[in-house]
Amino acid sequence: MQDVCEKLDKGLLDFAIVMNYVDLMKYNYLPMSTKDKWGVVMRQDDPLAEKESFSVSDLKGLPLICSKQWVDQEFPQWFQSDLGDVNIVATYNLPFNGAVMAKSGMGYALMLDNLVNTSAGSGILFRPLLNVPDAEMYVIWRKYQVFTPIAELLLNELQASFR
């Protein structure tokens, strides 16, 4: 997330799609109409695959594979003061890499739904996390940005779609 915002700040990108842990006061933004669910990606043959969903307390003691951004932003809020039983064995920047680690049996990857293939033949599956906030998504751009005509057209389309 930080890399994307840096590129936006330097003018290398016109727009970015980000989650709710960006300082929205720094940018103009449009909230997207969809929200994503957090969950656990694991091997399809894992004994815990029988569970339909997980709570944060279910994660304590499990070998967790987490997004680097999640560890920095959401992690402290979810576990509050109970950090002693949390076992993060790896972090990832790309969801695909987290899924590969989970498929290899390294642990349980925490990620948003629909970021990786969890269909029947994939070898992994997704189980939702209960009682955690959904991830809200935003289209952001620099304040006082002067757009090219095509970027201006895209902004107009985005505004019409999300309002």
Q: What is each model feature region?
A:
Residues 17, 29, 40, 64, ...:
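Generic preference for hydrophobic
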Residues 25-31, 35-37, 97-145:
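Beta-alpha-beta core module
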Residues 57-58, 140-163:
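Extended ligand-binding regions for polar small-molecule ligands
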Residues 27-38, 42-64:
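Flexible hinge/capping segments at coil-to-helix
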